[in-house]
Amino acid sequence: MENNSSVLDSDIVKVDKYEPHKIANGKNEVTFFVASDEIDFADLQRYRIQAQTDYLIAISTTNKYYDCLGLADNVISCSTDEVPLVMQAFQRLHSGSGIIGMSWDEVKWAISGNKNIEFLHGVAGGENCVTFACEQFISKLQRLSSNYPIKNVMINMFADISFGCEQQDFIIKQIDKNLMVKDATTFYQLSFFDEFADWKSGERGCCVCMFLIYDDKSNDSLIKHI
């Protein structure tokens, strides 16, 4: 597996979420929407055009196929409670807030032409937070099923300021050991948070977020989410 760590772009990449009848406030490089039968096609298209959206990304929280998924450039599968984290982790892949990370051009390269994306994460606080966070997302990783090979992987690590190279290397080794793929390009991002959902200021914490991008050439499959 190839690992890529690059200098982040200084350009601001705007990521926003579509809501019914929302008025765009400038250009969005990425617009997210949560897939459902309630999506108004015409209004979604209006917002996409108004926001000059480069990538319209659907978030699917069920195994059901919704007609609105046909409008999306990409579909990220996750559980309902992961929706806010999906958007946060995706935006911070190229936010310039991390030590290592991706440029916006690399994010576009990773997702372009590959519609289906699976989101996994593990999070923990306390003394052994890195180990526990890894155990969480690896157990999910081992239960995945898809008819298509993994083409690219984007990983975002959120951690408190005590996080160092040793912990980072541990996570990377665990991923290399358990993600059995060939010819996949893997990108890493590391961002520090004094406070996060699972830890307060002064506490230790780690959240590992993974976007698995499938080589789904037919662009018609849905990933069976666990």
State the predicted function of each range.
Residues 1-226:
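Tubulin/FtsZ superfamily GTPase core signature
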